[in-house]
Amino acid sequence: MAMLGNVLHLSPMVLATTTTTKPSLLNQSKCTKATPSSLKNCKTIDELKMFHRSLTKQGLDNDVSTITKLVARSCELGTRESLSFAKEVFENSESYGTCFMYNSLIRGYASSGLCNEAILLFLRMMNSGISPDKYTFPFGLSACAKSRAKGNGIQIHGLIVKMGYAKDLFVQNSLVHFYAECGELDSARKVFDEMSERNVVSWTSMICGYARRDFAKDAVDLFFRMVRDEEVTPNSVTMVCVISACAKLEDLETGEKVYAFIRNSGIEVNDLMVSALVDMYMKCNAIDVAKRLFDEYGASNLDLCNAMASNYVRQGLTREALGVFNLMMDSGVRPDRISMLSAISSCSQLRNILWGKSCHGYVLRNGFESWDNICNALIDMYMKCHRQDTAFRIFDRMSNKTVVTWNSIVAGYVENGEVDAAWETFETMPEKNIVSWNTIISGLVQGSLFEEAIEVFCSMQSQEGVNADGVTMMSIASACGHLGALDLAKWIYYYIEKNGIQLDVRLGTTLVDMFSRCGDPESAMSIFNSLTNRDVSAWTAAIGAMAMAGNAERAIELFDDMIEQGLKPDGVAFVGALTACSHGGLVQQGKEIFYSMLKLHGVSPEDVHYGCMVDLLGRAGLLEEAVQLIEDMPMEPNDVIWNSLLAACRVQGNVEMAAYAAEKIQVLAPERTGSYVLLSNVYASAGRWNDMAKVRLSMKEKGLRKPPGTSSIQIRGKTHEFTSGDESHPEMPNIEAMLDEVSQRASHLGHVPDLSNVLMDVDEKEKIFMLSRHSEKLAMAYGLISSNKGTTIRIVKNLRVCSDCHSFAKFASKVYNREIILRDNNRFHYIRQGKCSCGDFW
């Protein structure tokens, strides 16, 4: 406003002077007479045109030397108008067009980004019979590099060899740059290695080529060879590229060495280098160092602010990112579209609609709404803030709806749990890329539509140009793990290996979890052991795999190994270790781990950790100690804590304490069906049928229903699901016959049905029949009649397996010499020759 005020208060005399100013006569005279010396003084296209008119009047428009210089000077200006004028002059004098004239035009068009025109001029020169020189080829290759015209560049390389310029340093540097920019790094390296002489441009082109692709390690290695072995002094471009390579590698140690080299070598640090250093430190999680650099060089640099803000967003430090944005505004730095992307993304992650609207207002006021990526970010923000109507208004106004735009809509629906709407949008997309497929597959998995996710993945295989990546396979592996389908799990692992998908720590961790959930702990641990870079999540997955397999001792060994390797366990890792102790009955070790959380590792126990301890103590029969732990909690115990106690009371048969725990649950979570079911189980086991009936009546009055028990089994790639009491399976007569056979043979070996699992006051015969229709027994019988002798039977149940079915499975495994692997909602049961891995402790 101050500047505007100064303009408004100019005196009339000043206004008159400023509005009547005419072009300087001195400038006019410098370009009026057409001489080579006056051409140098022409600074604008109008002056060049004036010079050309003067040249024509003087009859010098046929002077090759002067016309060539006019074309060159016009190209140097680099505007579309000056290039068109240069080409017009060139066209009128083409009969005596020179190599220098062509070089000027090719270079001018390439430098201005008009690369296709530059390439056409190069080809036109070749066809005109004018021989190129050592400058022509680099200018042509520059155009090919910028436009990624790989075919044209390769043809130019052929001409270079044919015409004897292959050993020229300037030409060789251009070839290295061209191949590197086009991603042909092997070809670039071949030219580089064959060079008899290399300068800083040669090394920088190769290093930057590696750094911009997925060969950051090669970029770093080549840099140190350059400065140590060859003693070539790098320039600022070299330094920016090698610093960015360290950032990609997240290699703080090497990044520090590069920064030390900069300080010791006396290389002048410019803004781009500082931005690259900040980016590197942020990506290496050295946030404090990045912040010191940022503060040292000030907040007045736009690129530096953008580097800081975008990395804050990437780290999830969204409030800090917005702080940088506010600092820019206070410092008078005008945010650009990159700044706005970080700001909008921060609002999106925070789900802060007020700040998001403020960013949207800034976008509209500053004309950024024409940028597709800005609109895509706004759509994402509004969808995450549950403002779908606003998101769709932006979507409808966009004239250029890219695949990224559509992906934002699909992702927004997935984020809001609207899987059907996401699917409908996905189906109508005019174009789909791998992100589209990954988004919808992930949405289906999040919606527990696991089989549908796998079907979509199979459909994706027929799409030309769409190849699964690590993100795809993580979703599919997760779906497979939830289904417990081991054959599918093995195929997924084979698919990853066959298609060369990189097994990084995230995908590897997902595969460990997948095989663990599918009852194959050996494969899970094999993948874990193959990972070269294991983070806390990978170790936690391995600990969980051993815990689910009933190998509590090995799970604790892994937990200790992780700590010995210098990794700090997080809350999730402690859950895995405590769960292992609970499943294995390791009370003392569980206590030691629990009390070490805050004391040794600085991790405050949360509800879930107390729940694990209550479960551990309760299973061991230490109910009074479990209650004391609950009473000593620093926070109010939630319904999950009390449910752990209730489950323990059922195992121990403590009716009074079970009723107390159930009462607490019904206050905290009155809709929780499981607590009513558990309490009714306790009453039924104690023969207190009236109390059980009251619980059931209370459930009915509140509209609560026990979820039906379902068990699934895969036979020859097809999933068969059974529900307790359901007799609709087409093989039901054969299943019933097998159940009768197993029951008789198990009875001869001493199996007695556990009638306490029937929660109805009916006669003994009816109870036995009801037990025979439990879903896991139906699945087990179908497995026995449908699979080959000696093969493993794998069953997945949605609820906890009852004691009668557990006992029944042990007898069946012994009678038929089968391994039965039963996964319930709590753990795995590996049953062999009448014995279970859980030791009847579950």
UniProtKB/Swiss-Prot annotation:
Instruction: Tell me the segments the record calls region Type E(+) motif.
Output: 717-747
The residue spans of each PPR repeat are 98-132, 133-167, 168-202, 203-234, 235-269, 270-300, 301-335, 336-370, 371-401, 402-436, 437-463, 469-503, 504-534, 535-569, 570-605, 606-636
Name a Pfam family for this protein: PPR
InterPro entries to which the protein is assigned, alphabetical: DYW_dom (IPR032867), E_motif (IPR046848), Eplus_motif (IPR046849), Pentatricopeptide_rpt (IPR002885), PPR_At4g14850-like_plant (IPR046960), TPR-like_helical_dom_sf (IPR011990)
Gene3D superfamilies xref list: Tetratricopeptide repeat domain
The reply to whether Repeat figures as a keyword in the UniProt entry is yes
Residue ranges for the region (Type E motif) are 641-716
* Keyword annotations: Repeat
PANTHER family noted in UniProt: PENTATRICOPEPTIDE REPEAT-CONTAINING PROTEIN, PENTATRICOPEPTIDE REPEAT-CONTAINING PROTEIN ELI1, CHLOROPLASTIC-LIKE ISOFORM X2
Q: Which family does it belong to?
A: Belongs to the PPR family. PCMP-H subfamily.
This protein is called Pentatricopeptide repeat-containing protein At3g22690
Which species does the entry assign this protein to?
Arabidopsis thaliana (Mouse-ear cress)
